[in-house]
């Protein structure tokens, strides 16, 4: 705030000082003298209202950038809608190309068993992608209930001024506290939290599988289409040169029809889009898989990293209190209780709820063993 006032009042103060230095203090008219007095009076009033000895440069910078923060928070909400529409349009375009361009080509070349395998796998993968994306968008991540005093809280949220349970963090875009918040995903236009974290990861995983499947399966078609496009460019160039050398203006008929041209371009588009998404989304999926194996979220990774360094400086070892072991972490995350659940809850669409309520967490075995040993002593 102090920097803003100096920026606005600096030119006016400089003009008044120049007038005083030029000798207008005694010879200035009453009107100018009154302006000088009002300026000084206004400056005193402004300082008496806004001056704060505890405010520094950080406070001034935060106040100056507050409109920018507000603009970003509100614009990102609309960007989320655009990103969701973009995901739907791009996914729909790949499905349309697969039915209109790829399917007629493979029907003439693939055997019946191979066609059956591709038919079942592709539709199974597509169903899982659509199901998990829809669930990730429409399922609330989970919010701590307000007005209850029986919740085990860790701290008080500085934004909401409400009790904040363990693993709960405030989302500045949603302007709410989220249970076991991982991050705010603009591609979902939703926060990723306790109740939709599984849907988010499953969508990333099956979308990566689908992109790898399309990219690998259409490799031969992509090479043929790319070679055909290069041939079309060369033929178009030769055709223009031939027309320019002729004395009569008669365009020769095209060698490739419009449908063939669009088919070749669509196959190239499919391969490049699926390959790029497979690389980018695959890296993100691997990263979240590592975090899930460690029993932490994206936010908790940064918090645990700082805590690990702090304890390491004191000669102590940090252990994540929510790490149940790699396999048990995946069971808790996926909601798997029996061996049959790997099929019915992971490989098939399932809307089962995750373990727990997102506000209280059972301690891992090593914490229970340590507490028992302390009680025994």
From Swiss-Prot:
GO terms for molecular function: palmitoyltransferase activity; protein-cysteine S-palmitoyltransferase activity. GO terms for cellular component: endoplasmic reticulum membrane. The DHHC domain is required for palmitoyltransferase activity. The active site is at 185 (s-palmitoyl cysteine intermediate). Belongs to the DHHC palmitoyltransferase family. The chain crosses the membrane at residues 78-98, 117-137, 199-219, 267-287. It is found in: Endoplasmic reticulum membrane. Interacts with ABL1. Interacts with COPS5/JAB1. GO terms for biological process: apoptotic process; DNA damage response; eye development; heart development; protein palmitoylation; telencephalon development. Residues 99-116, 220-266 are lumenal. It comes from the Eukaryota. It is a multi-pass membrane protein. Residues 155-205 form the DHHC domain. It comes from Macaca fascicularis. This is Palmitoyltransferase ZDHHC16. Its EC number is 2.3.1.225. Keywords: Acyltransferase, Apoptosis, DNA damage, Endoplasmic reticulum, Membrane, Transferase, Transmembrane, Transmembrane helix.
């Amino acid at each position: 705030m102090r920097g803003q006032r100096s920026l606005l009042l600096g030119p006016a103060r400089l003009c008044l000082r120049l007038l005083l230095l030029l000798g207008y203090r005694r010879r200035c008219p009453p009107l100018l003298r009154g302006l000088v007095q009002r300026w000084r009076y206004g400056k005193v009033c402004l300082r008496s209202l806004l001056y704060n000895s505890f405010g520094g440069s950080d406070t001034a910078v935060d106040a100056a950038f507050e409109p920018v923060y507000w603009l970003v928070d509100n614009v990102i909400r609309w960007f989320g809608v655009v990103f969701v529409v973009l995901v739907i349009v791009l996914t729909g375009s790949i499905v349309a190309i697969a039915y209109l361009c790829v399917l007629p080509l493979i029907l003439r070349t693939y055997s019946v068993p191979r066609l059956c395998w591709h038919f079942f796998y592709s539709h199974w993968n597509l169903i899982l992608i659509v199901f998990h994306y829809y669930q990730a968008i429409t399922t609330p991540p989970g919010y701590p209930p307000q007005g209850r005093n029986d919740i085990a809280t860790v701290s008080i949220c500085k934004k909401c001024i409400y009790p904040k349970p363990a693993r709960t963090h405030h989302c500045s875009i949603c302007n709410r506290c989220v249970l076991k918040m991982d991050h705010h995903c603009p591609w979902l236009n939703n926060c990723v939290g306790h109740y939709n974290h599984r849907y988010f990861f499953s969508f990333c995983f099956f979308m990566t599988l689908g992109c790898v499947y399309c990219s690998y399966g259409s490799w031969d078609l992509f090479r043929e289409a790319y070679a055909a496009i290069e041939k079309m460019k060369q033929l178009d160039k030769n055709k223009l040169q031939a027309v320019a050398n002729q004395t009569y203006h008669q365009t020769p008929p095209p060698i490739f029809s419009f449908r063939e041209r669009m088919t070749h371009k669509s196959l190239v588009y499919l391969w490049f889009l699926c390959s790029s998404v497979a690389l980018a989304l695959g890296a993100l999926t691997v990263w979240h898989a590592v975090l899930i194996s460690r029993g932490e979220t994206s936010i908790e990774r940064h918090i645990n990293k700082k805590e690990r360094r702090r304890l390491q400086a004191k000669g102590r070892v940090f252990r994540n209190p929510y790490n149940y072991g790699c396999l048990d972490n995946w069971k808790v995350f996926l909601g798997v209780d029996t061996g049959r659940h790997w099929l019915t809850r992971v490989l098939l669409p399932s809307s089962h709820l995750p373990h727990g309520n997102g506000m209280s967490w059972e301690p891992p075995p090593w914490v229970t063993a340590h507490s028992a040993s302390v009680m025994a002593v």
